[in-house]
Amino acid sequence: MKEKIHPEYKEAKVVCACGETFVTRSTKPVIKVDICSKCHPFYTGKQKIVDTEGRVEKFMKKYSKK
């Protein structure tokens, strides 16, 4: 393998919007995510609408019956 062409692969801290943190490996030191396994509806068993940048409101406004 050639030297000095591969990225540095080290431990990275993953931070979720819910506050959960865990360590994995990556080329970046910190990774910020919106949903993790602690708060994702599939893993928690709770129904929850995940709204990113008001997409649900935009859809409801556009297609709601008046």
Curated annotation (Swiss-Prot):
Q: Which InterPro entries match?
A: Ribosomal_bL28/bL31-like_sf, Ribosomal_bL31, Ribosomal_bL31_A, Ribosomal_bL31_sf
A Pfam family that the UniProt record links to this protein: Ribosomal_L31
Kindly indicate where the leader peptide sits in this chain.
Answer: none
GO terms for biological process, alphabetical: translation
User: Could you tell me the keywords of this UniProt record?
Assistant: Metal-binding, Ribonucleoprotein, Ribosomal protein, RNA-binding, rRNA-binding, Zinc
**Details of cofactor binding:** Binds 1 zinc ion per subunit.
The domain of life for this entry's organism is Bacteria
Q: What terms describe the molecular function in GO for this protein?
A: metal ion binding; rRNA binding; structural constituent of ribosome
Look up the record and name the cofactor or cofactors this protein needs. Answer: Zn(2+)
Annotated binding of Zn(2+), by residue: C16, C18, C36, C39
Q: Which GO terms describe its cellular component?
A: ribonucleoprotein complex; ribosome
Q: Which family does this protein fall into?
A: Belongs to the bacterial ribosomal protein bL31 family. Type A subfamily.
Q: How does it assemble?
A: Part of the 50S ribosomal subunit.
Tell me, in a sentence or two, what this protein's role is.
Binds the 23S rRNA.
Q: What is this protein called?
A: Large ribosomal subunit protein bL31
Source organism (scientific name) = Thermodesulfovibrio yellowstonii (strain ATCC 51303 / DSM 11347 / YP87)
Q: Give me the gene this protein comes from.
A: rpmE
